[in-house]
């Protein structure tokens, strides 16, 4: 509007008007002032300092009266909105809940572990405000203590309907308003629909927790339309987004507490549909909270280091045991949040990864992990879409097995040369084994070149 020759056309969108059209526009709207000259009457109309000071003075007076009439509510408002602090009993609540997870040592899906965490933490942190995109029963995000928002009544849980982007954008608005800590939920594969809202939460440094369940091909018969492949790697590279993929109930509890405590950005929890065993009995809370740590070390120097997350941690432990039977020492690193791990100091990161060749294991696209394993390591992942079938069968079909992990470690790192069993073999058999090892190395290089 106002550009006599370009208004109503695409020429006004994304391109300068040009000297002649600017002059014509000035004449059209009656603007005689020089460029960057702001008339005094316009400046005074837009200068909000004096008016703002009056508004602030009036608000402070109203809040003082409110505090006198409702001291408890005013203190809660100050804590949540003005100080942005968690409740005074938060540290004790957190420690007690994590300890209870360790005592139970349950084999449960991490989505169920997340539900248990919410049930314990929502009453302790009343500003938590949940919701799901029509999948509350599958995401397990509606817990005892949740109350759905209706047209006539308030609550702490919103049924957003099948609109992942709308849900995420609304939660961003709730976070920007202050006083509430929103979490949202859907299947991980549907994060594609929420992508811009996720990115904006990270860009604006807003506290939102995204609960994304059914995190891999392990979900089973829903098939490739519902089985995420590229999603976790692509979400990890969004700046300022912490992506957690916990391996058991304890890692899930710590992921939740870290997400609640984070003040400068959003967090995402990728959670399993299938049950997972307890694997962190000996891991410390502090190490897990660092995003990556040595879960199971070996005696002496490791010949290979396995790095895994979530449901693949058990595979790494089984592969470690298989290699130990061959006399090959392996270390297992659990890395539930690469983003948090990368923020640790260099000395800590080096102490966890170690000097041995690395094999990363995750039922996602493999490309992300090459920055950790380098050119001398390998990645056991999936660079194709999934299949419909029972979760374990699909995992086996796509090579996400302890046997394939151990085989990859042998083929990729040269560990086979070190095997004591080989040293005891007749020379002809040793030569045959070395030829097989070289063939595996060649096959691995060819696969790397193709991906």
Model-derived features: positions:
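Thiamine diphosphate
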Residues: 1-44, 49-439, ...
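Short, intrinsically disordered C-terminal tails of secreted or membrane-associated proteins
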Residues: 448-450
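Cationic, low-complexity basic patches in intrinsically disordered or flexible, solvent-exposed regions
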Residues: 445
């Amino acid at each position: 509007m106002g550009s006599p020759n370009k208004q109503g056309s695409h020429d006004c969108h994304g391109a300068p008007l040009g000297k002649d059209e600017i002059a014509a526009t000035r004449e059209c709207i009656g603007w005689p002032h020089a460029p960057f000259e702001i008339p005094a009457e316009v400046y005074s109309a837009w200068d909000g300092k004096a008016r703002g000071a009056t508004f602030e003075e009036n608000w402070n007076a109203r809040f003082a009266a409110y505090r006198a009439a409702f001291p408890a509510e005013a203190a809660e408002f100050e804590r949540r909105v003005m100080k942005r602090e968690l409740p005074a009993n938060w540290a004790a609540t957190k420690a007690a809940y994590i300890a209870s997870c360790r005592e139970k040592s349950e084999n449960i899906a991490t989505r169920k572990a997340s539900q248990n965490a919410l049930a314990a933490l929502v009453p302790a942190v009343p500003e938590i405000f949940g919701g799901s995109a029509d999948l509350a029963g599958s995401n397990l995000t509606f817990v005892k203590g949740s109350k759905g928002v209706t047209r006539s009544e308030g609550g702490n849980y919103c049924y957003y309907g099948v609109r992942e982007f709308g849900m995420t954008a609304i939660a961003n608005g709730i976070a920007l308003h202050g006083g509430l800590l929103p979490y949202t939920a859907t299947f991980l594969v549907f994060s594609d629909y929420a992508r811009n809202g996720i990115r904006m939460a990270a860009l604006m440094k807003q506290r939102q927790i995204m609960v994304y369940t059914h995190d891999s091909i392990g979900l089973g018969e829903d098939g490739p339309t519902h089985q995420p492949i590229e999603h976790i790697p692509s979400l990890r590279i969004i700046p300022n987004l912490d992506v957690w993929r916990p391996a058991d109930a304890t890692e899930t509890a710590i992921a939740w507490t870290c997400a609640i405590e984070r003040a400068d950005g959003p967090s995402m929890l990728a959670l399993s549909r299938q049950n997972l065993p307890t694997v962190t009995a000996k891991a410390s809370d502090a190490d897990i909270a660092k995003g990556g740590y040595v879960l199971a070390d070996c005696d002496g120097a490791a010949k290979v280091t396995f790095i895994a997350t979530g449901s693949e941690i058990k595979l790494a432990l089984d592969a470690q045991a298989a290699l130990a039977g061959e006399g090959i020492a392996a270390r297992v690193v659990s890395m539930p949040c690469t983003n948090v791990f990368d923020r640790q100091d260099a000395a800590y990161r080096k102490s966890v990864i170690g000097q041995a060749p690395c094999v990363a294991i995750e039922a996602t696209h493999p490309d992300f992990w090459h920055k950790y394993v380098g050119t001398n390591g390998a990645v056991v992942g999936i660079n194709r879409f999934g299949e419909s079938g029972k979760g374990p069968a699909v995992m086996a079909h796509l090579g996400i097995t302890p046997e394939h992990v151990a085989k990859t470690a042998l083929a990729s790192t040269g560990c086979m040369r070190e095997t004591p069993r080989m040293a005891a073999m007749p020379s002809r058999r040793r030569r045959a084994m070395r030829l097989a090892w070289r063939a595996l190395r060649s096959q691995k290089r060819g696969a790397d070149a193709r991906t």
